Regions:
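Conserved ABC ATPase "signature" region
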Residues: 34, 38, 43-60
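A short, surface-exposed alpha-helical micro-motif characterized by mixed small hydrophobic
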Residues: 130-132
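Conserved ABC ATPase signature
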Residues: 64-71
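Catalytic Walker B motif of ABC-type/P-loop ATPase nucleotide-binding domains
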Residues: 89-92
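ABC ATPase "signature
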Residues: 148-149
């Protein structure tokens, strides 16, 4: 079913955290959360405060978003994606360009979402993250599907996803 044909309730159960920041840099962290909450008709201030704590931004609540570090901006982007309590969330390159501590924080948060039963669709070029987080995998090369199946299936035959992908590229005559 095309997204546009879903009802409002179904659309509000799906969330996207894009690679590019999707917040307003001239608003504070708190103002951004309140604005995006209003789009989903979320009025529970307590929930927004919990969300701030969940992404470890409580102490940055009153900072302008543009003054946050890259890792904190990723956390704000992630928090905005969680405002609507999605049952399906698309995470596009969510750990690109951030420090190791923020990266691990986000990976742990994504793992917690999975444990809560949220369906996570995770795009990444970091194959180690995929090994760590994902059950199923779709690999694309230049827009073409090259693998669809379980991560475990690849790991049983190969040493790593990197080895699988590099072997595929070599067989196809591509080089890195």
């Amino acid at each position: 079913v095309p997204f546009a044909k879903l009802g409002k309730k179904q659309r509000h159960q799906i969330s996207l955290v894009p690679q590019d920041f999707a917040f307003y840099p001239l608003l504070t962290v708190w103002e951004n959360l309140k604005f995006f909450a209003s789009l989903y008709d979320v009025r529970d201030k307590g929930y927004l405060l919990e969300l701030l704590a969940k992404v470890d931004l409580t102490s940055h609540k009153n900072k302008l978003a543009k003054h946050l570090s890259g890792g904190l901006k990723r956390r704000l982007n992630f928090a905005i994606g969680l405002i609507n309590r999605p049952i399906v969330i698309f995470l596009d390159e969510i750990t690109v360009g951030i420090d190791p501590q923020s990266r691990q924080f986000i990976l742990d948060s994504v793992a917690a979402l999975k444990e809560q039963g949220v369906t996570v669709i995770y795009t990444s070029h970091y194959l180690q993250e995929i090994e760590q987080l994902c059950d199923k995998l779709v690999l694309l090369n230049e827009g073409n599907l090259i693998y669809q199946g379980s991560v475990q299936g690849i790991l049983e035959e190969e040493q790593s996803l990197e080895r699988f992908y590099l072997d595929f590229l070599n067989q196809a005559g591509n080089t890195c």
